[in-house]
């Protein structure tokens, strides 16, 4: 112990050799006790100015900001469906049953533009489904082709329904009375032939002059189309009924 009268020496900084080094395994124990302590500094968000420079960390890896929840509908989209002149009156009469599925089920905004003869659909902030606009367009188009509202609503509820359209001239070239007789064979007396094809194939058929529209599943449309083509080519309705019964029985056995 120095004498009380001795000069006091200034405290010198410890040399590098005197600094105690961490014992091997100490870091491991610290990490086990405090998980995530190593990345504490790396997780600190630093305000970044708007620049094109990529932010990287000490190891050269790019650093990205945390992901944010973004509304699935990023922008407003609009569809305009033209309405044929002969379907404007049915559209006005059935409008009260057409717009509720579009607004309540698909969460779309819709309006009927009488001046331009179109139905306008628009997505909104409440729209959650990405394909809602396309479904709404298919629903309105099905009505413009001549399908009932109840049948067209099935396009909104089921994903595996389609509409296939073709003309009589695509099957066989006909003019005048021969074409009228072909349409009569497809419809039948009081529409019995058409109803029989619809019930057997589980489809819906619309006869619009020389155009034929079929709504249903892929295999069901194929069955109904084969029956309609056979009638156009002149096959007797009795044979068509027989083929329908056979194929319908096979379809029931499958399911």
From Swiss-Prot:
SMART domains: KH
Record keywords: Cytoplasm, Nucleus, Ribosome biogenesis, RNA-binding
Keyword Cell inner membrane: no
Cell compartments where the protein resides: Cytoplasm; Nucleus, Nucleolus
GO cellular component: cytoplasm; nucleolus
InterPro entries per UniProt: KH-I_PNO1_first, KH_dom, KH_dom_type_1_sf, KH_PNO1_2nd
Chain ranges of the KH domain: 179-228
Quaternary structure annotation from Swiss-Prot or TrEMBL: Component of the small ribosomal subunit, ribosomal RNA processing complex (SSU RRP complex).
Function: Required for small ribosomal subunit (SSU) synthesis. Has a role in the processing of early nucleolar and late cytoplasmic pre-RNA species.
Name used for this protein in its record: Pre-rRNA-processing protein PNO1
Species annotation: Gibberella zeae (strain ATCC MYA-4620 / CBS 123657 / FGSC 9075 / NRRL 31084 / PH-1) (Wheat head blight fungus)
